[in-house]
Regions:
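Domain-level signature for soluble enzymes in the chorismate/prephenate branch of the shikimate pathway
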Residues: 1-380
Length: 380
């Protein structure tokens, strides 16, 4: 058989496959009607396990895994189709619809907002980008910001999530696993670091440089020019600047913003010392309540998947099948569960699309743990 004959044979097989797939989905629709009438869940995990075992027996050894992957995707498509036929009558889509209905049309210009650090922190600058007149309450660390939201001390909290140079803020992702919250908005802030000192300090005098670990990671090349200086991490760039200002010493410096320099009376020995000129940090605005404002086009999710081959593939295949773009995937180890991870997903999708509603109905049933973290828009 030559190439053209082989391709023709494949075309004929594909015609049969599409016909059989259509017939299979028609059967799935009948099953959906039965499940609705008898108040049964769409997902029948036991039935799917039996089917996959049977498929494994039918497939030749060298195609067994491929056959299981194929049918896992078919099962996902079938469930999503059933959810759509049933009107996405699942709890999460209902919760999202209720939040859309109850959320005001405009993001609040004023609110009590929790920020980590002190006056001049980048979190403050991000907060002022999101709110016209925020009442900011400062906390010493990120965990305190999450706690302030959970306890109702503040309506919103501003948290840095990732940087274009240094990557994800791992400490924040780990805290996200421990706290209950929703993301209601995000923004990107251009981060420009200066080497700040007390007036009269010279570059050759510096023996200690203070800053947050993310800022230190963003300025590695510049710090190599200070081989005699000890690099000391602290909770916040603004706290570093405040410490230098109050230290009374002329052998210490801080990596922080020019805003901090002006605020604390410091001199910039060097400006824009970050490795990359386009250095941006993405901040999220969190709330205790689920609020979904008009224009929300990004959704964040957290999942703990079964510790078995193909579990992540099953989720990614569902995104692909529904035409939903994955913007970011992050994994973090789960405490006290060796080599098991929680996965964070950022998706680009309209909250009004049928595909989004199908996804929200489908995902909770295929995860060991599932958390919907919110749908929101990003302020540029």
């Amino acid at each position: 058989m030559n190439l053209e004959q082989s391709r023709k044979a494949i075309d004929e097989i594909d015609q049969q496959l599409v016909k059989l797939f259509t017939e299979r989905m028609a059967c799935a629709a009948e099953i959906a009607a039965y499940k609705k009438e008898n108040n049964l869940p769409v997902l029948d995990a036991g039935r799917e396990r039996q089917k996959l075992a049977a498929i494994s027996e039918m497939a030749p050894d060298d195609l067994e895994n491929s056959a299981r992957c194929l049918y896992s995707l078919i099962f996902s498509l079938s469930r999503a189709y059933q959810h759509r036929l049933l009107g996405n009558d699942a709890e999460l889509p209902k919760k999202i619809a209720a939040a859309i209905e109850s959320t005001p049309s405009l993001f609040p210009p004023k609110a009590m907002v929790a920020c980590q650090g002190v006056e001049g922190a980048y979190s403050q600058l991000a907060c002022e980008k999101l709110f016209q007149a925020p009442n900011i309450l400062y906390f010493s660390n990120f965990e305190a910001v999450f706690s302030a939201i959970e306890k109702g001390l503040c309506q919103y909290g501003i948290i840095p999530l990732e940087n274009s140079t240094a990557g994800s803020v791992n400490k924040v992702y780990d805290l996200m696993l421990q706290h209950e919250f929703y993301i209601v908005r995000s923004t990107r802030l251009k981060v420009d670091h200066s080497l700040l000192v007390r007036p009269g300090t010279k570059l050759e005098d510096i023996r200690e440089v203070y800053s947050h670990e993310q800022a230190i990671g963003q300025c590695q090349e510049f710090l190599k020019t200070l081989p005699n200086a000890q690099i000391i991490r602290c909770e916040n760039t603004a706290q570093a600047a405040k410490f230098v200002a109050e230290s009374g010493r002329n052998d210490v410096a801080a990596l922080a913003s020019r805003t901090c320099g002006a605020l604390y009376g410091l001199t910039a020995l060097a400006e824009s010392v970050q490795d990359q000129g386009n250095n941006y940090t993405r901040f999220i605005c969190i709330s205790k309540n689920l609020e979904i404002y008009p224009g929300a086009d990004r959704t964040s999710l957290r999942m703990v998947l079964a510790h078995k081959p193909g579990a992540l593939y099953q989720v990614l295949s569902l995104f692909n099948a529904l035409g939903i773009n994955l913007n970011k995937l992050e994994s973090r180890p789960i405490p006290e569960r060796d080599f098991e991870f929680a996965f964070y997903f950022d998706l680009d999708t309209s909250i009004y699309s049928p595909a989004f509603l199908q996804l929200m109905a489908e995902l909770p049933g295929i995860c060991e743990q599932f958390s919907y973290l919110g749908s929101y828009s990003e302020v540029i």
